[in-house]
C-alpha cells in the first residue's frame, strides 16, 4: 500500500443516487490512499455531495459552506470540494460565493476526482461540470465492503440500473443535473 494521502469526510445530502455516488467517491479515494474521517474537523479533504431536489437545497449548501469557513481558518490546508446536483447547476458560482471552496465537480465528473485533486495542488480552483459526451453507460460499481472506505452498512448497497431522465417535467431538475437517461445495457 502507498503512502496515506489523508482523511476524507463526505457529507451527503438528498437521494439514494447521492448515497450511491458517495460510496463511489469513498471507494475511488480509497484507491488514492485516503481513509475515512469521522468528522470534518479531522479531515484533510471534505466533500459535500449535494442534492438540488430536496427543499431549499442550495440554501443548505451555502449555509454549510458558511459554517465551514471556520474549518478552513483553523486548517488552511484542508481541501473543500462541492459535488453533486447543486454543483452541476451552480458551477463556478459556488467558487464566487464561497472562497473557502477549492473545487467543484458535477454528477458526471466524480470519477475525475483524482485529477481534480492534482489540479488543486497546483493552486488552481477547478470547476468540472462537463457532461460526458457521448453519454456513457452507467459504470459498474460494486462497493467493496471489505475496505473501511465503504460508508454503507454491510447489509445495504445501491445498484444503479439507470441514471438521468428523459422527461423534462416543469417541476423537476433531474434531467438538468443528472442528464438524459442512460442505462447499464
Write out the residue ranges for each language-model feature.
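Proteins enriched for Cys/Gly/acidic motifs involved in redox and nucleic-acid/cofactor modification
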Residues: 1-185
Amino acid at each position: 500500500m502507498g503512502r496515506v494521502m489523508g482523511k476524507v469526510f463526505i457529507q451527503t445530502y438528498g437521494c439514494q443516487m447521492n448515497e450511491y455516488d458517495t460510496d463511489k467517491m469513498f471507494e475511488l479515494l480509497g484507491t488514492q490512499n485516503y481513509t475515512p474521517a469521522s468528522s470534518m474537523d479531522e479531515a484533510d479533504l471534505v466533500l459535500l455531495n449535494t442534492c438540488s431536489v430536496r427543499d431549499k437545497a442550495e440554501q443548505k449548501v451555502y449555509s454549510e459552506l458558511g459554517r465551514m469557513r471556520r474549518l478552513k481558518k483553523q486548517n488552511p490546508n484542508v481541501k473543500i470540494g462541492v459535488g453533486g446536483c447543486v454543483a452541476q447547476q451552480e458551477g463556478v458560482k459556488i467558487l464566487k460565493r464561497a472562497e473557502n471552496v477549492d473545487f467543484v465537480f458535477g454528477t458526471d465528473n466524480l470519477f475525475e476526482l483524482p485529477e481534480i485533486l492534482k489540479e488543486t495542488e497546483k493552486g488552481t480552483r477547478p470547476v468540472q461540470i462537463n457532461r460526458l459526451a457521448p453519454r456513457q453507460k452507467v459504470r459498474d460499481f460494486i462497493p467493496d465492503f471489505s475496505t473501511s472506505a465503504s460508508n454503507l452498512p454491510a447489509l445495504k448497497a445501491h445498484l444503479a440500473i439507470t441514471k438521468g431522465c428523459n422527461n423534462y417535467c416543469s417541476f423537476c431538475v433531474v434531467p438538468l443535473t443528472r442528464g438524459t437517461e442512460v442505462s447499464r445495457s
